[in-house]
């Protein structure tokens, strides 16, 4: 039977499953689609459909990611699931699949494991704002006290990484039992089967606990400048794609980065040779700026609402270093290494001042394939902020991907 198109009338939220290998992330993804399909809110996807995720490229890195979509009574969701641990690391750092929230899957039979910890840390570093927990494989735990113990362990772990461990919803269940119940009885309704109900309960928690994100157009205006040219008798035009917010003719904007911040007024906005009164997030526009000479503005600067972004030279970041097979370096690099950082629209030279491991110890050397916390310093100030993505390049090829976790100065 042909399915009608999803109506985009509900608020949209991006989520994903995270957690240790074999704890049931992909099985849960399949169980959510199977359960919501009972009410027509999804197309049921089998484990194999999700697991055979196609490769995609983001910032020069190949990542395997499966995307499914579904809806609850309140919302429309886009859900990402990655087959391998390395794919998660790359996905979260490149922001290839931006997550407004995550479902952390923990096996009730095993409790938190090393990748559970690593995914929570990564979520914190890359700015995944909210987590809901699914304690999977509950059917394998006979002792109620054991289940409570695992829940306590998960809450403590979340709190250790500055998530509100005491408040986060933790939903027990079994993804496999839910799928089997639906396979055995495809007309099962909510209230008929305890395992199916537990998947509904999880989605209720996701609906209630993960807030609807602010849309890009509701944020403050920012556009990275891609090109600059002069129009005789009219002034200087900066072109680029509006990253966020809305901008109107007559408004003041700041030109930030590279040199001292300048303020100017927008005298015109053009898109596809047509003049506009305002430009929105996602639009590729040319913005005419009053009293700015061609020499005062260049690619790599940003236009922004005054007072909303400042230029910085030093920052901490979470970085994934490409392997040789991914087209990265063949050899390690050390503190003091000076690559190019590709930030928004331009390459900036910077030097790496420190590498730090997850446990806080200082590391001297980084190998291809590593994920590391890195402090770096640009040779001139650039408009950066926490959560911003960048690539690390050497001679024009990408050798790493990173996300700013903290501004130093």
Curated annotation (Swiss-Prot):
Ligand binding (Mg(2+)): 26
MF terms in GO: GTP binding; GTPase activity; translation elongation factor activity
Disulfide cross-links: none
Localisation: Plastid, Chloroplast
UniProt region (G5), positions on chain: 174-176
Gene3D superfamilies hit by this protein: P-loop containing nucleotide triphosphate hydrolases, Translation factors
Positions contributing to GTP binding: 19-26, 81-85, 136-139
Domain of life: Eukaryota
Any single Pfam family the record assigns to this protein: GTP_EFTU_D2
Domain tr-type G: 10-214
Ranges for region G3: 81-84
Region (G2): 60-64
GO cellular component: chloroplast; cytosol
Keywords: Chloroplast, Elongation factor, GTP-binding, Hydrolase, Magnesium, Metal-binding, Nucleotide-binding, Plastid, Protein biosynthesis
Known catalytic reactions: GTP + H2O = GDP + phosphate + H(+)
Coiled coil spans: none
Region entry G1, spans: 19-26
PANTHER family, per database record: ELONGATION FACTOR TU, MITOCHONDRIAL (PTHR43721:SF22), ELONGATION FACTOR TU-RELATED (PTHR43721)
Family note: Belongs to the TRAFAC class translation factor GTPase superfamily. Classic translation factor GTPase family. EF-Tu/EF-1A subfamily.
Name of the protein described by the UniProt record: Elongation factor Tu, chloroplastic
Organism: Phaeodactylum tricornutum (strain CCAP 1055/1)
